[in-house]
Amino acid sequence: MSASDLTSVQAAAPQGSRQILVTSALPYANGQIHIGHLVEYIQTDIWVRTLRMHGHEVYYIGADDTHGTPIMLRAEKEGLTPKQLIDRVWTEHKRDFDSFGVSFDNFYTTDSEENRVLSENIYLALQEAGLIAEREIEQAYDPVKEMFLPDRFIKGECPKCHAKDQYGDSCEVCGSTYLPTELLNPYSVVSGATPVRKTSKHYFFRLSDPRCESFLREWVSGLAQPEATNKMREWLGDAGESKLADWDISRDAPYFGFEIPGAPGKYFYVWLDAPVGYYASFKNLCERNGIDFDAWIRPGSKAEQYHFIGKDILYFHTLFWPAMLEFSGHRTPTNVFAHGFLTVDGAKMSKSRGTFITAQSYIDTGLNPEWLRYYFAAKLNATMEDIDLNLDDFQARVNSDLVGKYVNIASRAAGFLIKRFDGRVQDSAMNHPLVAKLRDAIAQIAASYEAREYGRALRHTMELADEVNAYVDGAKPWDLAKDPANAVALHETCSVSLEAFRLLSLALKPVMPRVAEAVEAFFGIAPLAWADAAKPLSSAQPIKAYQHLMTRVDAKQIEALLAANRDSLQAEAAGAAAAGANAAKDAKSNAKAKPAAVNGADDAPISIDDFAKIDLRIAKIVACQAVEGSDKLLQLTLDVGEEKTRNVFSGIKSAYQPEQLVGKLTVMVANLAPRKMKFGLSEGMVLAASATDEKAEPGLYILEPHSGAKPGMRVK
């Protein structure tokens, strides 16, 4: 039996109370929560609520990820200490999670004494096991800020295609990867200074040790997701290949984080202490509530431990984290569940289009957070597939499913029951075949939730809602109410409808807990659990007056949401411009900090003759596929009106799924000299637009001509 099959069986027929620790990835404490983040927290929260409704002992743990160079520099930019920054962001994050009903048992911070002690103890245990190595490495160093620079804090000219303002490890124009030392005209993003090379002692976790490889090969066999297992096997390679590399776990001062014991001026890399933050947050909860922390995290513990993450951090959670735990004397995760990314209207979230939607803007615009919980759940399954928030579909699905199908059932029956029957159901109606069918379906729906097949659970629920509405339409209680002789039939119809509504509310409770709470108050019943499927409404407990449970989504609300996030971008741009002006003044006053002209002569006008040298052609994308081994590249097969198609590698993977591009027309540079790349020969370049500051305004957009253009046409 597979791990996913076992999960389904446990959901349908829980054998006693289980002890379960659940985490979501820790949000980084230098920005706002947006709807892309919420996919994961909503997914985890639904699973946690499902388990709680079985009566299991479940703890859902979270924290802000608070250490690292970006935090330190962001705080400096805002005139704050790092501690002041992370305290403010923690308050904002906690507010957003509360708004969306994310039910953490503890939401903490990695900048805590518990995390420092646990991180040190894990490090010292790994050191004792002979799994920590010391090495001298050469790095880029900012002579003005007197700090070593991570690759992403260096920019310059791509050594391959000569695009300007590219990061120190890869080019987002041509997709090439390279060493920071190969970058042309490099400069520090922090100060503008030209980096120098300096050596420094660093500390490494010896993941290449045969003990780690042997352990991970065994551990990977228990992963529930085939995609994760395949990726792990790709990273591990075949037996004897030794593909695992040692992991640099240290950073040099100045750095906001925990100093490594016995290594003054050296700090734990944020990715070492961040996952330890799961345990630190749980330990904080345990100490406040008298829970035996060690019983949950020691080897051989009967407690279960699950991590929900995005697929982009699978590497850290399925290689480093379990190996760190195994060789430091802790239990290892029971499983890791990864999800895909979120697109909005089929494209990467964009600040310029207003689709980079923050959690707070959603709330401020007046949208119901349970609408989004429902929509995401309807799209989620147990795989790593990306999901799309189509705003038109969002409006239509919420209005149809939740208002038209679900809420409508109660509103059609409650008034008659209160007016004609003192709010009391007909007990004999609780045995109606339709009620029995819904009651029997609850175990299947609960099993789908625990198997993380939320879309399947909700499809099943809405199919049942359709049957209930068909029953009401056929019985026509509004007609029955016209004749007192139909009182018994009317009573039965209303009673069946409301018991069906109770069962549908039970099925929807993990997704829409606030609506479920209102339903519980309406019926005057205790909080619903899965076992309550067998406890129908009773004439002994009259229902309360019906209160409207949910409004429809208005298109104007969606328009206001997009506008609010576009306005937010404009405010950011104004602030960035002011900051940029100040930075320019600072750079001017310090000549040695001035980079070699990044733009300089390149900004000078060119002649029409220069432009005429570039052969721009319309190209049709006839095939497109991801490039295995590259996080940035797509391989395009282009029809440019020649006898043969062209093969082009383009660094646009972050913005498009391959299937989105097939059949589209675009513009390519047709006379660019072919370039041999690691993955094959690239015979040109497709053109894409992006903002100057891609961090402030992320997004890549290929150029598309108007209809009528044909492959091979010149762009003049």
From Swiss-Prot:
It comes from the Bacteria. One of its GO terms (biological process) is methionyl-tRNA aminoacylation. It is found in: Cytoplasm. Binds 1 zinc ion per subunit. InterPro entries: aa-tRNA-synth_I_CS, Anticodon_Met, M/V/L/I-tRNA-synth_anticd-bd, Met-tRNA-synth_bsu_C, Met-tRNA_ligase_1, Met-tRNA_synth, Methionyl/Leucyl_tRNA_Synth, MetRS_core. ATP binds at residue 351. It is an enzyme of class 6 (ligase). It catalyses: tRNA(Met) + L-methionine + ATP = L-methionyl-tRNA(Met) + AMP + diphosphate. A motif ('KMSKS' region) lies at residues 348-352. Its cofactor is Zn(2+). Residues 610-716 form the tRNA-binding domain. Its EC number is 6.1.1.10. One of its GO terms (molecular function) is ATP binding. Keywords: Aminoacyl-tRNA synthetase, ATP-binding, Cytoplasm, Ligase, Metal-binding, Nucleotide-binding, Protein biosynthesis, RNA-binding, tRNA-binding, Zinc. Is required not only for elongation of protein synthesis but also for the initiation of all mRNA translation through initiator tRNA(fMet) aminoacylation. Homodimer. NCBIfam families: metG, metG_C_term, PRK00133.1. This is Methionine--tRNA ligase. It comes from Burkholderia orbicola (strain MC0-3).
